[in-house]
Amino acid sequence: MRAIGSVPDEPTAASVWQCVAGSTIDDHLLEWPPDVFALTETLLERSEAYRFALSPPDDAEWPPSEVPRWPDAVVEAGREWSRWAEDRHGPIPDLLAREWKILRDAIDGPFTDLRQAHNWRLCSALLTLHAIADEACAGLGVALDASHEDGVRYRVRGRELLARTGSLARIPAHRLRVLPKIRTADGGSSVRALSRYASVHSPGVELQWHKVPSRPQGTPLYDKGVNYLLLPWPLRVRESDFRPRPESVQRLASETFGYFEFVPSEGLDLDLVDRMLVAALDEVPSVRVVVLPESAVDRDEIDDLEALLTRHGVVGLITGVRARPNRPGQFPGNWVHLGLWTGEQWVHIKQSKHHRWSLDESQIHQYHLGGALHPHVRWWEAMEVPQRSLQLIEVGEGATVVSLVCEDLAQIDHVADMIRSVGPTIVVTPLLDGPQLSARWSARYASVLADDPGSAVLTLTSYGMVQRSRPPGRNSSAVVALWKNPGKGIREISLEAGAQGILLSASTDRAMRRTADGRWPVDNGSELFDISVYQVRAAKTGSGLAYQRTGSTAPPMLDTSELTILSCWAEAVADALAFAPEQLEAVRADALADAPWRAELGLPKPSGELNQAISRMFREARTAMDTGREPPLDAVILAVRATHVGSPGLDQLVCRVLRSAVEQRRNRRPTVGEALPSTDERPVRPAELPPQNERAG
């Protein structure tokens, strides 16, 4: 036993990895590229050797001249590796084998060889392995143009692994996670800047990755627009809506604290929602998503609200939800409800709130709540504090959505780190807060996420709370929402007199993925930007549609995890049809419940319902192929359109999921990611690029 105060042994790459992952560095890691990505990023971050890709030592150069056309070479090696990982037949790519041997031979050397670049050849090998592994992770999460004929079965296995475990790696998630990366910041010099397809995360936050086909039926493929109906409700918040929790006031040392609840006196006005949708649809052809603030809807109102939205063709709902306690002594619930309509069922996803709101004396005066909450007591929101988790939803065309509740936006914790590493397309934050002015806290934290990783951010609060917010010497404001685009200014969104809601129109487009290690930029990412704002005043009459639910809500045909897995296999079918139709049968064999790869990855067999759905999907694809129509993608679209009409519920869902994946694949044009650059010009290191404009304010 080492004596206390004695000098510990010098750490090595092997000992660092053993401490982090609980395993050794051996050739077994090469069987699964995300495992090697986890290894290389861990070593680069712990040693800070990632900095040498940005600023190599004086006697070295990066990218390395001993690898001809290094940017092309690592991309090609990644593609070859993804193909090899399917069956593991033959040798691994030469560049991968050469750099891996350099690392393996040095794993027991002092860690300072990496930290101080004493062994530059080892540093160079580690950076090259990291780039190759990152390229081999292309398409494991968001299957955009990173997909190709190489590795179709490998990619769908990775997607199912992600859906089941919340990680792309085989390493236990309680040690670390490997997650897909959606967006990369244009600047930055952390280890995150060295990857564009994958990211590594320390344990502590549970993550669920969802994939839901929520594109409205009949939407033209060229239509990239998204219309959000923002309902900043309640329109009136009374002082009596804030209530002290009975017998909750206590004194700790010299400070008195207690708990409060927010319970609006009026429920959700579904008739007004109906008339708002009538008015909005008079302005635009469709409303894709309805958004409401924190605690705007009671849990028992969700089903009726979604039934109404279905009648109007709305496919998404993002709303703060409050829930009464289930038993005496329990605190109320507070979360974001994300509802997605597939065409056959509403998928429900719950993003919990992790941090309580605290009202001090200044805020009690600001919101004029002194008659309900004593100003000399620090009041904490009465809510259960759940385990930290993050729900990330992929909704098609590379777009991903994350939602945070109020206080969670302002916390710099593991959830925030995960969001910055993954880089969702948009972060939606329902609030119970004052005006969303560019000078207030929500704008500051929105700007952080818009800068790094480059997500669009939407915040929405209640008009009633905005009107209650009247700090001394200031007039009330009507700014209920805020939109921040990456690289652009903040848009303050006000609710005009006589309006009850706002129509926010946005659009998606391709975005560049860049890395700081010298690889070529590729335009296979996606971004979301705002276009216009329109004030919505409720129509005088409603739609006349019946929307109250009748009886109990039917259970979903597939749960969210199963629907995600079904969507993953639909993408694999689309990839096979687009690039290598002869591989369709091999992909089908991998989808079978008894396929051996699941046991190798420690995954359970699909449930009976999921297995039935996957089998039906492959039958549809094979039937379409047998017609002989060309191209295969069009043949499948025609076939599922015909089958969809009048089919049983699960068959309809299968056809819709398959059609969504095939249409998206058909609609994508070739990109730089599919056709490598032919120029001999070497890539420019970030240090040589012109400086980025600093964020205003």
Predicted features along the sequence, with ranges:
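CN hydrolase (nitrilase-like) catalytic-core segments centered on the catalytic cysteine
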Residues: 5-132, 140, 302-319, 329, ...
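Cys-nucleophile CN-hydrolase/nitrilase-fold catalytic domain and related Cys-dependent amidase chemistry
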Residues: 267-354, 442-447, 451, 600-612, ...
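Active-site catalytic loop in hydrolytic enzyme cores
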Residues: 196-221, 329-422
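Long, compositionally biased intrinsically disordered regions
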Residues: 28-31, 39-46, 53, 63-80, ...
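Structural motif
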Residues: 231-234, 288-289, 294-296, 316, 399-401, 404-408, 425-426, 430-433
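Short, compositionally biased "basic patch" segments
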Residues: 219-272, 360, 365, 374-391, ...
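Long, charge-dense tracts
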Residues: 52-236, 240-256, 293
